C-alpha cells in the first residue's frame, strides 16, 4: 500500500470510539483556542477585506463567517474563517519530533482544518462528536505530513501552514462527507496540486491568506472529488508528487504506520500561543516579562537588552525596527520593548500605534538579537532563549527559558484557555456569547447539532463593523496604503 493510499485508508476507517479520551480532551482545548483567535482576527483589516470579497461573490449555500452576520458558500466561509484564524498570528503551533527540524516548529495546525470543518460541518448538519472526529483526523494527517517532509520545504521558502494545511483540511472534510477510500485518494491528489504559500509574504496580509486558502482548498478539493473529479492516486510519494517536488523527499519512518500511533496531539504535541506574535519569540517574551516584574524594571533603568537564541530564530524574526503591527509580530526588539514598557504582550500591545510610539522606538534601539553558541549546540527541538539585561547602575540581570507557557511541557489550564478566549472573543462578540461558546466546547461531544455554537460565534456586535460601507472603506484604505516592508538584515 502506497502512502497516499495509507492516509486515505486511515481517514476512511477511523471512528470516534477509536480516539483516546486524552486526545478528545486536548482537541477541545485546541478548538476553543482556534475559535477565539479567529473571532479576534475577524476584526482585523485583512479579514474585513476578505469578508467584502466573500460578500461580493455571494452564493446560495450559506455557512457562517465568524464574528459577523455574514454567511457564504462553504469554500468561501472556510477562506474567510481561515484568514481570520491566522490574522493575528495567535493560533497554535505544531512541535517537531526531531531536534534537526527547522525551528523545532512546523505548522499552525488548527486554523486550516478548523475553518474547513466549521464550514462543511454546518453545511452537513453534523453532531459535536462528528465535528471533533473530523478535526482530530485532519490535524493528525496535517501534522504527520509536516513532520515527515524534508526540512528543505520550509527552508526554501514554502509556508507549510499553507501547503500542508490544505492536505489536513481536505481529509477532515472528506471525513465529514463520508468519502470512500478511493475518493479520499483523489481528494488528496486534487488538493496537493493547489498547495502554495511563500514565506516572503510574512509580515503582510498574505500570510494569513495562506491559512485561508489552505482551508478553502481543502473544502473545494473534497467537494470536487465527491463529484467524480479525477487526480493521481499516488500524489504524496510519486516522483513528480507532493513530497519530491515540494521538498526533494520525506522521511517515510515519520508517517508510514504512524497515523494515530500515537496521536500527534499527545506526542510530541501542539503548543498554544500565549502571545499574538511569532512562536519563536515566545520563550524570550515569557522571560522578559518575568524578569521585568521580578526586578521591577523600567525603561529608564535599562542600558541594553541582549537576546540569545539559535541561528534559525533570526531567519524568522526578521524585523529589527518594525513599522507596523504585522512586522512587530516578527520582531524581537519590539517584543522586548513592549514588555518592559507595558508589562503585557497581548492583543492590545500589537497594534500600529504602539509600534510607532517614540518611547517604544527608543527602547527597541537598545535590544540586540544574537546567536548563542551554547543554545545553538543544543539543537532546534526547542526555541531556547537567553536574556541579559544591563542596567545603568552596573548590574546585570540574566535568565534562560527553553519553552513558553502553552508548550506541552508547560500546558495552559482550561481556565487559562478560557481567559485567552475571552480576550480574543471580546473584540467581536458580546461577553454572554463568549461564555456560551466556552460551555458548548466543554461538552462538544454531547451536542446533537452545531447550531447553538454557530449562533454564539456571530453577533449583533459585529453587524455594525461588517456593514458594506465600512468594508468598502477598509478596501479603499488598503488600496491607498503602501506596505513598506523591511528587508532581511
What feature does the model see in each segment?
Residues 239, 484-485:
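Composition-driven detection of intrinsically disordered, low-complexity segments
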Residues 278-439, 455-475, 481-483:
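Intrinsically disordered, low-complexity Ser/Thr/Pro/Gly-rich interaction regions
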Amino acid at each position: 500500500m502506497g502512502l497516499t493510499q495509507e492516509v486515505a485508508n486511515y481517514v476512511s476507517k477511523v471512528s470516534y470510539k477509536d480516539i483516546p479520551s486524552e486526545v478528545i480532551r486536548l482537541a477541545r482545548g485546541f478548538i476553543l483556542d482556534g475559535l477565539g483567535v479567529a473571532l479576534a482576527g475577524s476584526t482585523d483589516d485583512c479579514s474585513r477585506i476578505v469578508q467584502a470579497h466573500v460578500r461580493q461573490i455571494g452564493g446560495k449555500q450559506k455557512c457562517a463567517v465568524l464574528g459577523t452576520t455574514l454567511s457564504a458558500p462553504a469554500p468561501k466561509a472556510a477562506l474567510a474563517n481561515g484568514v481570520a484564524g491566522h490574522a493575528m498570528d495567535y493560533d497554535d503551533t505544531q512541535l517537531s519530533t526531531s531536534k534537526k527540524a527547522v525551528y523545532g516548529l512546523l505548522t499552525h495546525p488548527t486554523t486550516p482544518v478548523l475553518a474547513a470543518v466549521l464550514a462543511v460541518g454546518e453545511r452537513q448538519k453534523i453532531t459535536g462528536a462528528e465535528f471533533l472526529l473530523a478535526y482530530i483526523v485532519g490535524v493528525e494527517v496535517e501534522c504527520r505530513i509536516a513532520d515527515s517532509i524534508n526540512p528543505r520545504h520550509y527552508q526554501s521558502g514554502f509556508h507549510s501552514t499553507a501547503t500542508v494545511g490544505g492536505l489536513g483540511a481536505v481529509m477532515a472534510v472528506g471525513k465529514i462527507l463520508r468519502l470512500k477510500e478511493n475518493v479520499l485518494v483523489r481528494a488528496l491528489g486534487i488538493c496537493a496540486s493547489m498547495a502554495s504559500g511563500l514565506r516572503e509574504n510574512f509580515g503582510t496580509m498574505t500570510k494569513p491568506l495562506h491559512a485561508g486558502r489552505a482551508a478553502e482548498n481543502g473544502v473545494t478539493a473534497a467537494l470536487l472529488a465527491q463529484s467524480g473529479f479525477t487526480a493521481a492516486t499516488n500524489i504524496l510519494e510519486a516522483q513528480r508528487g507532493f513530497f519530491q517536488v515540494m521538498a526533494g523527499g520525506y522521511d517515510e519512518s515519520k508517517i508510514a504506520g504512524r497515523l494515530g500511533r500515537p496521536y500527534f496531539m499527545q506526542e510530541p504535541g501542539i503548543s498554544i500561543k500565549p502571545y499574538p506574535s511569532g512562536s519563536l519569540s515566545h520563550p524570550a517574551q515569557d522571560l522578559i516579562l518575568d524578569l521585568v516584574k521580578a526586578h521591577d524594571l523600567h525603561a529608564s533603568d535599562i542600558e541594553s537588552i541582549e537576546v540569545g537564541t539559535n541561528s534559525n530564530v533570526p531567519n524568522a524574526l526578521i524585523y529589527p525596527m518594525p513599522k507596523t503591527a504585522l512586522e512587530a509580530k516578527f520582531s524581537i526588539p519590539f517584543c522586548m520593548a513592549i514588555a518592559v514598557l507595558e508589562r503585557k504582550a497581548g492583543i492590545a500591545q500589537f497594534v500600529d500605534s504602539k509600534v510607532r510610539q517614540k518611547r517604544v522606538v527608543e527602547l527597541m534601539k537598545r535590544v540586540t538579537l544574537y546567536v548563542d553558541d551554547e543554545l545553538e549546540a543544543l539543537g532546534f527541538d526547542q526555541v531556547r532563549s537567553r536574556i541579559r539585561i544591563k542596567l545603568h547602575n552596573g548590574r546585570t540581570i540574566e535568565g534562560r527559558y527553553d519553552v513558553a507557557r502553552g508548550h506541552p511541557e508547560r500546558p495552559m489550564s482550561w481556565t487559562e484557555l478560557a481567559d485567552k478566549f475571552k480576550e480574543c472573543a471580546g473584540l467581536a462578540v458580546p461577553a454572554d456569547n463568549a461564555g456560551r461558546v466556552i460551555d458548548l466546547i466543554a461538552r462538544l461531544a454531547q451536542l446533537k447539532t452545531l447550531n447553538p455554537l454557530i449562533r454564539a460565534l456571530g453577533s449583533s456586535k459585529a453587524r455594525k463593523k461588517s456593514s458594506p460601507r465600512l468594508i468598502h472603506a477598509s478596501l479603499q484604505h488598503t488600496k491607498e496604503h503602501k506596505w513598506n516592508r523591511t528587508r532581511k538584515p
